[in-house]
Amino acid sequence: MGNLFCCVQVDQSTVAIKETFGKFEDVLEPGCHFLPWCLGSQVAGYLSLRVQQLDVRCETKTKDNVFVNVVASIQYRALANKANDAYYKLSNTRGQIQAYVFDVIRASVPKLLLDDVFEQKNDIAKAVEEELEKAMSAYGYEIVQTLIVDIEPDEHVKRAMNEINAAARMRLAANEKAEAEKILQIKRAEGEAESKYLSGLGIARQRQAIVDGLRDSVLGFAVNVPGTTAKDVMDMVLVTQYFDTMKEIGASSKSSAVFIPHGPGAVRDVASQIRDGLLQGSSANL
């Protein structure tokens, strides 16, 4: 820019306001212009057409009585075809924009709860932009974009919100852990039930094999040794099994056993009890 030999340079993205004897005459676009100062022509000022940004911090209160600082970022620029309005009608453009932002935010936020303010910040930005567009277009300015860039509650409120969020996440984690333990216990119980079922099948087959072996032994012994009865053979088998059991208990150093009468007479008593039980069961079936 300059004024040399009645010539004026206007830079790119800038316009100059030309006056003659203090009266607006024309808007000078970028380039070199002739202004005969001796005829009263002069440049009253320059107006930038670049996009400018204004950050406005507004303190207000929400519907649930929480004080928050809302930071709005306003991007605006002067219109080349309304440069004279932008230059002459407003003396403090930034102050005017700030006043409208305060008005809209303090009218919108008190209607919302704190959580809703965060969720509806785009709606608040849109309301601010619409109000600014209506007001500033009459002064030769265009609102390019309006953003709500930050919402800052009081520090104590932020701490409380973080604690609530942390408690909710801990509760969710506890529920998930309890559910996992429940599933683990169910699976463990199902496994134990299946194991016991298979163990029962094995025991049943083992006992069936023992019964079959005893029956074959009794029959074979009775055939090979004349004069013996089934009772004599059974007593002998029980005594043999008794000594086998005592041998197994004595062979193990860490065995757990329930001590019962262990004399041969006691074995005969046990055999009598078993036979009596079997005979009573057979009589009941008949």
Curated annotation (Swiss-Prot):
SMART domains: PHB (SM00244)
Matches recorded under InterPro entries: Band7/mec-2_domain, Band_7, Band_7/SPFH_dom_sf
Localization per record: Cell membrane
Gene Ontology CC, one term: Golgi apparatus
Superkingdom: Eukaryota
Any one GO MF annotation of this record: protein histidine kinase binding
SUPFAM superfamilies per the UniProt record, alphabetical: Band 7/SPFH domain
Lipidation (N-myristoyl glycine): 2
Record membrane topology: Lipid-anchor
Keywords per UniProt: Cell membrane, Coiled coil, Lipoprotein, Membrane, Myristate
Coiled coil (residue ranges): 114-190
Subunit (UniProt): Self-interacts and forms heteromers. Interacts with NB-LRR class of R proteins before R proteins (e.g. RPS2 or RPM1) are activated by the effectors. Interacts with LRR1.
Role summary: Positive regulator of hypersensitive response (HR)-like cell death. May be involved in potassium ion channel regulation.
Name of this chain's protein: Hypersensitive-induced response protein 1
Organism, scientific name: Arabidopsis thaliana
